[in-house]
Each structure stands twice: as C-alpha cells, then as structure tokens.
C-alpha cells in the first residue's frame, strides 16, 4: 500500500519504502481488527499523516486520533531510542527542543517567513557538535508540502543524529488573523506526576 504525496519528503527522503511498509501493515491491522478508533503519536507526524490519509482514501470506518507529543522535564521528546544515548549525547540532544522553542518564540514575535523560521531552528541545532542535523523543514500540517509563508496549520519538523541515534521532533504552528499559537507537546512534570502544557 502506497500513500502518494506524503512520503517523499521529511523522513521518507532518507528511508525509501519505509512508509509504504507502515501503510501496508496498518491497512492489514485495520482489516483484521476493524477498530472504531486508533491512536497514533504526534511525535512521528509524518506517520500520523500517512495513516490519516490511508484511512480516508480507503474509506475505512476508523477515527484516527493524534496523541500529544510527550517530553522529558528537560524538553527532550520521549522515545525508546533515548536509552541508547550516552550521558553526553543525552545532554546534547536537548538542543533539538531548544531549537524548536526558539523557533516558536520567533513565530510568536511575528515572523511569518518559513525560510527564516527554518534557518533559525537549523542554526540552533548546528551549535551542538554532537548533533548532526538531517533536516529542519516547515511544511503544511495536512499535506506535508513545503510552505513559504506561515499561515494556517504548519508543521516544523526536525530530524537529527546524536551519535548513532536518529531522533525526530516537531512542533505545530497555527497562524491566523488573530496571531499565532504554537504546540510543542506536553512535558512530564519533574516529579513524574501528571502532565503540564509546554511553553
């Protein structure tokens, strides 16, 4: 099963055929189980978009729910891959969230040029020697098509290698006539009790 138009860019550019595999497995799963609702994390925004398009294109009677991206207290997006980072790499990896956060500040200050936002995020990540940036992209949240101007719902997506570990992260930017809102996910409280909105 192939979902055209959503899989060529972002992670798909470095992982040929990956999302065709995802779409095929998910289509089989939905066919066997017949769920009314399915939950996918927003951290892998491209996968979520692919699954939503799959369900729509095949007219599957399933609601696809995006679950909030969850962060560690220091901002690093939660992932099973984090355990493979050394202590130095783990500390360095927080630059990914820092880049997104600084990008969010730029948007909230009024920046609407996607190229400028992309450069701001990328420049922050390249300050960390242990981090090798794969991409920092600004795309339409639904189609994943590159955008030039920030308007409507936009996804700022990042992929980077820290040591041998590949990490992804993103934030959603909503821009309308009233201004801009930014969704960086939710952050686990330092005590581990509950979740609090990210800022």
Outline where the language-model segments fall.
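Phosphate/ribose-recognition catalytic cores of enzymes acting on nucleotide-derived substrates
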Residues: 119-199
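Glycine-rich, Lys/Arg-enriched anion-binding loops that position phosphate/diphosphate groups
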Residues: 37, 44-134, 139, 197-199
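Divalent-metal (Mg2+/Mn2+/Ca2+)-assisted nucleotide/phosphate chemistry catalytic cores
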Residues: 1-39
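Hydrophobic side chains within alpha-helical segments
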Residues: 23, 47-50, 172
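Generic secondary-structure boundary/loop-capping signal
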Residues: 3, 7, 16, 57, ...
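Short, surface-exposed amphipathic charged segments that create phosphate/polyanion-binding patches used
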Residues: 1-2, 76-85, 147-153
